[in-house]
Amino acid sequence: KKIGIVLLILISLIGTLLGCGKQDVNKDLESIEASEIKQIEHTGTTGGKDGNYSYSFSDDEVIEFINLLNQVKLGDEVDENKALSSGAVSYYTIHLATDETLTISPGKYFKVADRYYEFDNYDELWDEFIVFNSIK
């Protein structure tokens, strides 16, 4: 009986620890403020020959993008191989006033730094990300 209780406690503890990382990422995205941003650079590829591009957001675009980013809800972390797909890819490098940078790549799976997550409210927000993906 003691072994069962110990196993239950270990499983609960591991579940809590695994869930904390996801909550931290959501909290980080929700708490970014436009006033903390020096610049947002949008880079990517259209998937075609000579399809690379780079663009820096205007002040108004930074505000709009951060407002959108604050609404993102991420789910479980997924394997990089599952998340990667061919075709067009957009990256947003957020340059913070603290001289730190955060690179994200929204898609069906949402990349934050070097990790990929389920994009839980993809259907709700994707059309708004398409607007930013179209700015070049």
Model regions and ranges:
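Sec-dependent bacterial lipoprotein signal peptides
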Residues: K1-L18
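Function-determining sites in protein domains
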Residues: C20-K136
